Amino acid sequence: MSDINATRLPSFFFPIPCISDDIEMVLTRGER
């Protein structure tokens, strides 16, 4: 999932896959 999130999100905004995973989870929870 880290690679997928890194690809979906801007690499310059989320350079670290771990951070992108955390933000992805937050965005998913906010949308639902």
UniProtKB/Swiss-Prot annotation:
InterPro entries: Amanitin/phalloidin (IPR027582)
Position of the Cyclopeptide (Ser-Pro) cross-link: 11-17
Propeptide part(s) removed at maturation, as residue ranges: 1-10, 18-32
GO molecular function terms listed in the Swiss-Prot or TrEMBL record: toxin activity
Alphabetical UniProt keywords: Toxin
Key word 4Fe-4S present: no
Keyword Transcription regulation: no
Lineage top rank: taxon: Eukaryota
Record PTM text: Processed by the macrocyclase-peptidase enzyme POPB to yield a toxic cyclic heptapeptide. POPB first removes 10 residues from the N-terminus. Conformational trapping of the remaining peptide forces the enzyme to release this intermediate rather than proceed to macrocyclization. The enzyme rebinds the remaining peptide in a different conformation and catalyzes macrocyclization of the N-terminal 8 residues.
Family: Belongs to the MSDIN fungal toxin family.
Function: Probable toxin that belongs to the MSDIN-like toxin family responsible for a large number of food poisoning cases and deaths.
Protein name, per record: MSDIN-like toxin proprotein 3
Organism: Amanita phalloides
UniProt lineage: Eukaryota, Fungi, Dikarya, Basidiomycota, Agaricomycotina
